[in-house]
């Protein structure tokens, strides 16, 4: 398995393309100059395209991915109704979902043969919309509205329209600020990192009565932490055994172990990392974690070790200015 790591650096308007080898070392293979401040990125389900959101002219760009080395070639673009904060796709590669924090909306862009061709739906009134996360069964789009302490739930119709479910939302505790999400591989649990109180919620996707329920909330931070809380990103290993979340003020990655059924998180430790870690990701083997420092302009690679999933630094690399997003593609 070959793996390519893409790093988005909006301040220098670049995507750095790296080869990740089996020992966790990175080799720079390409630097792409992007026409705008590139932030969120996602790889298409068939691994043929990288979709990126850019500002200040709000667009989604599609780059064709070379199957041999992961190199990028521009392919298409489509306008967006707001500044892109987060970008994702459905599992069939039919739609791109874009959450916009500033516009307070989530939009759906239709794909034709992998290329974006236009917005087919926009839902407004989602104050601080920070991500759009399709469930493993491709049926429910989870959309956190950070400023409203709620996660809205939509069914995606065959033509890409978003239909509010019943219930239409789940709520967090007041002042939590739900931000980014991941799902357990067993498809029974979701995990949401809350920006404003630096906590992680565990959501049971459907209990025996058909309800969605928060079954656990864990504080991410060390006991003696008294500064402003400012959590950012969350990811889980492919085997579902280890979960990680980062806080930008503390420049820490919190390490959690996950119970076998996915219902319980246990805090295992903390890893100091790059300054102001806005984004990170886990590779497809589940062996390495790559974190980007928005203020350090570097990335660090960590090996995931032991039953606890603690992090051991393998290498550090300069990237563009203000790196914010990390995507790993296996090919």
Curated annotation (Swiss-Prot):
Disulfide bonds: none annotated. GO terms for biological process: glucose metabolic process; pentose-phosphate shunt, oxidative branch. Its EC number is 3.1.1.31. InterPro entries: 6-phosphogluconolactonase_YbhE, Cycloisomerase_2, Lactonase_7-beta_prop, N2O_reductase_N, WD40/YVTN_repeat-like_dom_sf. GO terms for molecular function: 6-phosphogluconolactonase activity. Keywords: Acetylation, Carbohydrate metabolism, Glucose metabolism, Hydrolase. The modification N6-acetyllysine is found at residue 287. It catalyses: 6-phospho-D-glucono-1,5-lactone + H2O = 6-phospho-D-gluconate + H(+). It comes from the Bacteria. Pathway: Carbohydrate degradation; pentose phosphate pathway; D-ribulose 5-phosphate from D-glucose 6-phosphate (oxidative stage): step 2/3. Pfam families: Lactonase (PF10282). GO terms for cellular component: cytosol. It is an enzyme of class 3 (hydrolase). Belongs to the cycloisomerase 2 family. NCBIfam families: PRK11028.1. Catalyzes the hydrolysis of 6-phosphogluconolactone to 6-phosphogluconate. This is 6-phosphogluconolactonase.
